[in-house]
Amino acid sequence: MKSTHHHRAPLISASSSSSSSSQNHSFVSRLLLLLTLLPVSLACLAFILQWRGGGLADPASASVRSSTSVPGGSDLNHEVFPGMETVSSVSPKSHQSSSDCSNLARSSSPSFPYYADWKFGVDTSLKPKICITTSTSAGLDQILPWMFYHKVLGVSTFFLFVEGKAATPSISKVLESIPGVKVIYRTKELEEKQAKSRIWNETWLSSFFYKPCNYELFVKQSLNMEMAIVMARDAGMDWILHLDTDELIYPAGAREYSLRRLLLDVPPNVDMVIFPNYESSVERDDIKDPFTEVSMFKKNYDHLPKDTYFGMYKEATRNNPNYFLTYGNGKSVARVQDHLRPNGAHRWHNYMKTPNEIKLEEAAVLHYTYSKFSDLTSRRDRCGCKPTKEDVKRCFMLDFDRSAFIIASTATDEEMLSWYREHVVWGDKDVKTKLLRKGILTRIYSPMVVIQALKESGVFSSVVSSASTNLSKKKFLSSIHKSNSSRSTASESLPSKESKSEGISARHLLEAESAIPPLSPPGMEQARFFTED
C-alpha cells in the first residue's frame, strides 16, 4: 500500500499543475480579447458620435450656427464651406426662422445651405467687388449654372451682352430679374455707339475687322469689354473679368474656395491677374450637362514641368493639331482703373502704362470646349463659311476649329461621331491612367459639386418661376427700353462695310501691339527654345 501511494502522489501533482496552466492560458486569452475589443468599441463610439453631430457639423446647422457666432461666420463655416464665411451677415432675414430652410428643401439633403433664397444678396460692404462681362447667345440651361456658380465664388455683378437665343423674351426676362445682372441687347443703337468707340477707331484691333465667324465674335467681345469697363467703373467695381459661358473660374490656391478671397490676397501694385486655362477632357460621347458630368481636365503648360509637358506631348495631343483643342493663353482679371482698355478677349491693357501682371500658379479657368457632341453642329450652324481648307482660315483662328467645321459640314452623322470619338473623347483607359499619373490630366470635382448642389436646391427653378410670376409684359418691355437707352458711354459693334474706308482713314495709330487673339499652347517645334530657357 505504501508503495502504491508513493507512486500516485506525482500524478496528483502533475494534474494540478496542468489545471493551473490551463487557467493561466484562459486568463491571458480573455485579456487579449478585452484589449482587442476595447479600441474597436471606442472607434465605433467615436464614429457614432461624429455621425450624429459629435464631430464635423451638418452643413445646414453649421450655416445657422455661424449666424449666431462671430460676425462674418465662424471657423466651422470656413471648414465646411470655404468662401462662404459672410453668409450670415449677407441678409438679415436669412435665418429669421427655421421655416426658412423650406425654401431650399427641394431634395432630401441640405445640399446648398449657403443662402436662404435664390437672390444671393451680397453685402455691398464686401471687398473686393468683382464683376464678370460676357457676350453670349446661350440658353438658361448654360447661363444660370455658370452665373450662380460664380456668385458662390463672390462675384456680385454681371454684364451680359446678349443676342440670339439669350436675347429672346423668355430668357432675357429671367436674366433681368436676377439681382446684380445687367442685360445689354445687340441693337442698332448699340452698334452705332460702338462704331464711334475709341478702340474701333484705333489700329491695334483693326486686323480682325470685317472677317466672319470667330473674328467677328472676337471684335464684338472686345467692343463689349470696352463698354463693360465704363459700367464697372460707374458701379464701383474693383475687378473686371471677361469670361465666356463655357468657362468656370477654379480658385485653387486660395485660402477659401472663393475668387473674392483670391483677389483680396493680390498685392495692391498688381494691375492684372492671369488665370491659365485647363481644357475639359470628356470621357463619353453622350455628355448633356458638362458642368455636372465632366471632371477630367488637361492642365495648362504653365502649370506643368517643361520636361513633362514636352515628354508627354505626343500622347497628350493624340494626333490633333495642338496640345489643346482650342486656345491655351488663359483669361485675365483686371483692376478697374483709369485708362483701362481690353486687349482682345483674353487680356487687358492700359493706355498710360504697361500693366503690372502676375500669373497664378494654381488657380485656373476651366474651359469646357467641345464637351458635347452637339457642339460640332452648333458651331457649324453659326458660321456661313465654305468648308474648304482655304476659306476656314478666313473664319477661324485655331486649327482644331477649322478641322471641326469641315467635318461638321461635310461628314455624315456616323462619320462625325467617329471623328468626335477619335479626336475629343478620352476612351483609352491606359492612356488616361498614364497621363493622370504624370499630371498632364487632373481630376477636379469642386465645380461639379457646387453646381449639382445648386440644381438640387431648386435655385434655378426658383429664378425661372419668380421671373414668370413677377414680371408683367409691360414691365419687361420697359426694362428692355431702359437697358438700351440708359448707357451713356462707350461702344457698339461692327459698322457696315460701306463705312470701312472712312473708318480706316480716321483711325488713330496707337503705339501698341495688335490685340492678343486666342493662342495655342507651345508645340514640339518650340521644345528646344523652352528647354534652353
Curated annotation (Swiss-Prot):
Record-linked PANTHER family: GLYCOSYLTRANSFERASE-LIKE KOBITO 1
Start and end residues of each stretch annotated as Disordered: 1-22, 86-108, 485-504, 512-533
Name of this chain's protein: Glycosyltransferase-like KOBITO 1
Single GO cellular component term: Golgi apparatus
Signal sequence range: 1-43
Top class in the EC scheme: transferase
Coiled coil ranges: none
Stimuli inducing this protein: Down-regulated by light in a phytochrome A-dependent manner, via protein destabilization and subsequent degradation by the 26S proteasome (at protein level). Reduced transcription in light conditions in a HY5-dependent manner.
Comp. bias regions, Low complexity: 13-22, 88-99
Gene from which the chain derives: ELD1
Keyword Ribosomal protein (UniProt): no
Keyword ATP-binding: no
